[in-house]
Amino acid sequence: MNTWASKDHRIKIYQNKTNIGPVLNWNECFKHASGEYIKILWSDDWMALDFIERAVNLIDEKSAFVISNHKIVSENGIVDNVKYKKQKYTRKEYLYNILFQNIEKFPLSPGCALFRTKDLNDNFVIDIPNTDGLDSKKNGAGNDLLIFLNIVLNYAHISILQYDGSFFRAHKESFSIQNQLELYYEWAKVYFIQKKLNKTYYSNIKKIMFWQQINKGNKIYHNLYVCLKYNYWMPLSFCIIILGGVLNSLRNRK
C-alpha cells in the first residue's frame, strides 16, 4: 500500500494507534477522506471496474446515493441475484421498503453504494440506544443501515445502476452469517423512526413489529415493544389481520 501511496498523492495510508473496532474505524476513514465521494468496499466483497465512474455520472442533486444491482456469491455459485426494476425510487418508496418488508431487497450493507463524503460525515451514527445491552460498535450492524436512512431524508430519491456492479461474498466465516444480527437492525430502525420520522411512519412500524412478535412466536423483540410504548389501539382492519394471523399460527402448531 505504501508503494501505491508513493505513486499517487490521492492514496492515503492511515493506521490507528490501537484497535478501535469497526465502527470507530469507519468514522476515522470518513474524516480522513478528502474527495467529493466515498465508495465503501469491505474485504470480502468486490465491485465492477467501472462502478465508480458510472455511479458518479448517475448521481444528481436530488439523489441521496447510488446503488447497483448486486450478486451474493458463495464458493458454490450465486446465492442471490438482486436486480432492481427502476432507475430511481422515491424517498417514500425506499423508506417503506427498507423499514418494513423490503420487497425490493435494498441492501443493509453500504458496500454496493456511492455516497457524498459530506453526507457520510454529517449523518454517521456511532452509538445506537437500546435496552437489550447490544453494542453495535463491535460489529457495525445497524450503523451501516443508518447511513442509508439518515442520508435519504435529505433528498428526493435514490438512483440505481441497473447492472451487476457489486458482489458480496457469502462464506461461513462471514461476520453477518456467523452472527444473529436481526435484533441490531431492528433497534437501528426504531432509533431512526423515533428520532426522524412523523407519526404515520411511527405508527406503522409499531403495528408491523407487533405483528412480527405474534407471527414468530418468540420474545426477541420484547424490549423493542416496551421502547415503542405500544398503546394497543389499532384500526379494526389491522386487528382483523392480526386475529387471522393468530388463528393460522395456532392451526399450524397443532
Predicted feature descriptions by range:
Residues M1-T18:
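Acidic donor-binding segment of Leloir-type glycosyltransferases
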Residues N16-A33, W46:
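Glycine-rich, basic loop-to-helix element that forms the pyrophosphate-binding segment
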Residues W42-W46, N69:
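The conserved acidic donor/metal-binding loop of glycosyltransferases
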Residues R91-Q178:
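Conserved nucleotide-sugar donor-binding catalytic segment
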